[in-house]
From Swiss-Prot:
Organism name: Trichodesmium erythraeum (strain IMS101)
Gene Ontology CC, one term: cytosolic large ribosomal subunit
Superkingdom of origin: Bacteria
Entry keywords, A to Z: Ribonucleoprotein, Ribosomal protein
Family of the protein in this entry: Belongs to the bacterial ribosomal protein bL35 family.
Protein name according to UniProt: Large ribosomal subunit protein bL35
Region described as Disordered: spans on this chain: 1-28
Length: 65
């Protein structure tokens, strides 16, 4: 059986934690920032976990994560 290919776009966007969960960055932090509050921008800077309903799809895209 051949090796599975990794979706490189997904591999750049996700990282695994030590316990095996998947981390991601939040959206809406790249431009149009001047009307957003400092608190909102600060919260958007933090990483969060991929929701369990999407986790299986991410794992299929990154088989060796």
């Amino acid at each position: 059986m051949p090796k599975l290919k990794t979706r490189k776009a997904a591999a750049r966007r996700f990282k695994a934690t030590g316990s095996g969960k998947i981390k991601r960055r939040k959206a809406f932090k790249s431009h149009l920032l001047e009307h957003k509050s400092s608190t909102r921008k600060n919260n958007l800077s933090k990483t969060t976990l991929v929701h369990k309903t999407n986790e299986e799809n991410v794992r299929l895209m990154i088989p060796y994560l």
